Amino acid sequence: MARIAGVDIPNDKRVVISLTYVYGIGLATSKKILAAAGISEDVRVKDLTSDQEDAIRREVDAIKVEGDLRREVNLNIKRLMEIGSYRGIRHRRGLPVRGQNTKNNARTRKGKAVAIAGKKK
């Protein structure tokens, strides 16, 4: 397994897919990285030379990934909560942030349904 940005990426998969195991790199970013490094998308990770791995590492180092990206996202959410914006309040209350209805659904965000006493028929 090759190690890129502190993540072990699978050997048997194509490089373009393996790079998506790094937090912050999706398929589109993965393709851009490989194009900039001059590596084919069809190559398997186990077939990469050390020079190619170094080229990929250099390209990934220029992008904000893993811990830095997670920290930035968490700080952005914390900032929204501190300034008291609508989105920050929704984060604080554990409700959907992007305008979804909450009358019937939103169970993923709200958690397990709480039974109301005296509601039996």
Swiss-Prot record:
GO BP field: translation
Classification via SUPFAM superfamilies: S13-like H2TH domain (SSF46946)
Region (Disordered) location: 96-121
Basic residues bias locations: 106-121
Gene Ontology terms: cellular component: cytosol; small ribosomal subunit
Pfam families according to UniProt: Ribosomal_S13
Example GO molecular function: tRNA binding
Entry keyword rRNA-binding: yes
Keywords attached to this entry: Ribonucleoprotein, Ribosomal protein, RNA-binding, rRNA-binding, tRNA-binding
Subunit structure: Part of the 30S ribosomal subunit. Forms a loose heterodimer with protein S19. Forms two bridges to the 50S subunit in the 70S ribosome.
Family, as annotated: Belongs to the universal ribosomal protein uS13 family.
PANTHER family: 30S RIBOSOMAL PROTEIN S13/40S RIBOSOMAL PROTEIN S18 (PTHR10871), SMALL RIBOSOMAL SUBUNIT PROTEIN US13M (PTHR10871:SF1)
Described purpose of this protein according to its UniProt entry: Located at the top of the head of the 30S subunit, it contacts several helices of the 16S rRNA. In the 70S ribosome it contacts the 23S rRNA (bridge B1a) and protein L5 of the 50S subunit (bridge B1b), connecting the 2 subunits; these bridges are implicated in subunit movement. Contacts the tRNAs in the A and P-sites.
Protein name (Swiss-Prot/TrEMBL): Small ribosomal subunit protein uS13
Species name: Streptococcus suis (strain 05ZYH33)
Taxonomic lineage: Bacteria, Bacillati, Bacillota, Bacilli, Lactobacillales
